[in-house]
């Protein structure tokens, strides 16, 4: 028998708000979080505006030990751990350290890159013949699955622990993968989400491709203009988002607050064929994905009243 899947926890680390309350306030009051960065101007980037979450050392120490933060230089993992743990707590799930792993709990937490700044730091050391000084945490900070490894260790997760990576669809894909695993009865709760590193070494390639806006360096908050005729490119930014997906029966049994039910979803690819390319979607694939998502959810187009589009302002 297929299980019903619900969302019981949320966490967010965004340029316009770290934590649900701050983020919700920013969204309701039109606060974008996009600002001008002197570092990007110094490096002569065409686009000198960006979004970066404001995470203080004081806040970081609420999620990491001082030892863990020694030689730590991976913003994507920082953002992802904060969002993930916040979502877990928001779901009312235990943070108490147990001897046994949580065999029914796992994480599928996506990332596009991991520890780019740590890579840069390490490259300089290696080139200076100081490879032995890299430190014992360099690998976990720079491997793509570092975020899921950190979360699994902090939460004692014993079910599937995976990092997916599919460019702009990474976060949505993690939710669908988590949904499928719970629906099939292979897990009772999965922490799903995605995260992204910040800084010029992540954003530089996009700036070189000339896909970032260059017309709004003097007016950062007007830079991102999706669906506008005056759109001149996207604004680079970083952060993380997380959701706890849970077997509805288990959630109800423990009296959890339920935000929503996940009815279904679909994943496909345009194969870079027809009108599709590496960056441009294949229109036929988009149609098929939407149609199959509605079919798997048991709804019709008339039932859809909100569309959260992938609006990059390119």
Locations of regions flagged by a protein language model:
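Conserved beta-ketoacyl condensing-enzyme motif
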Residues: 7, 22, 28-163, 195-205, ...
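Short glycine-aspartate micro-motif
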Residues: 5-7, 104-108, 188-192, 224, ...
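Short beta-strand segments
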Residues: 11, 108-110, 165, 190-196, ...
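Short polar catalytic/cofactor-binding loops
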Residues: 10-17
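Glycine-/small-residue-rich "gating" segment that lines the acyl/pantetheine channel
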Residues: 128-135, 176, 180, 184, ...
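Active-site-adjacent elements of ketosynthase-type condensing enzymes
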Residues: 46-55, 114, 118, 197-224, ...
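Condensing-enzyme catalytic core mediating Claisen C-C bond formation in acyl metabolism
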Residues: 4-8, 31, 35-36, 219-299, ...
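Active-site-proximal alpha-helical scaffold in enzymes
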Residues: 80-93, 144-147, 152-155, 160-195, ...
């Amino acid at each position: 028998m297929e299980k019903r899947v619900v969302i019981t926890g949320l966490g967010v680390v965004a340029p316009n708000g770290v934590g649900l309350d701050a983020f919700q306030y920013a969204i309701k009051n039109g606060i974008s979080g996009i600002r001008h960065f002197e570092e990007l101007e110094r490096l002569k980037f065409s686009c000198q505006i960006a979004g970066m979450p404001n995470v203080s050392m004081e806040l970081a120490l609420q999620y990491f030990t001082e030892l863990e933060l020694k030689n730590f230089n991976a913003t994507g993992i920082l953002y992802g751990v904060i969002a993930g743990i916040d979502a877990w707590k928001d779901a009312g799930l235990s943070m108490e350290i147990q001897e046994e792993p949580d065999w029914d709990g796992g994480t599928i937490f996506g990332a596009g890159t991991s520890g780019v700044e740590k890579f840069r730091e390490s490259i300089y050391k290696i080139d200076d013949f100081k490879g032995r000084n890299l430190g014992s945490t360099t690998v976990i900070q720079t491997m793509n699955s570092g975020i899921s490894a950190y979360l699994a260790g902090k939460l004692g997760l014993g079910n599937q622990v995976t990092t997916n990576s599919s460019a702009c669809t990474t976060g949505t894909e993690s939710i669908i993968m988590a949904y499928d695993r719970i629906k099939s009865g292979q897990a009772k709760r999965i922490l799903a989400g995605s995260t992204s590193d910040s800084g010029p070494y992540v954003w530089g390639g996009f700036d070189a491709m000339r896909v970032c806006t260059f017309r709004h360096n003097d007016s950062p908050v007007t830079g991102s203009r999706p669906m506008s005729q005056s759109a001149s490119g996207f604004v680079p930014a970083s952060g993380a988002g997380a959701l706890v997906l849970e077997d509805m029966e288990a959630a109800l049994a423990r009296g959890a607050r339920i935000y929503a039910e996940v009815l279904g979803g679909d994943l496909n690819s345009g194969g870079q064929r027809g009108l599709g390319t590496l960056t441009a979607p294949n229109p036929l694939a988009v149609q098929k994905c939407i149609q199959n998502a509605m079919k798997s959810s048991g709804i019709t187009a008339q039932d859809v009243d909100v569309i959260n589009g992938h609006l990059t302002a390119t």
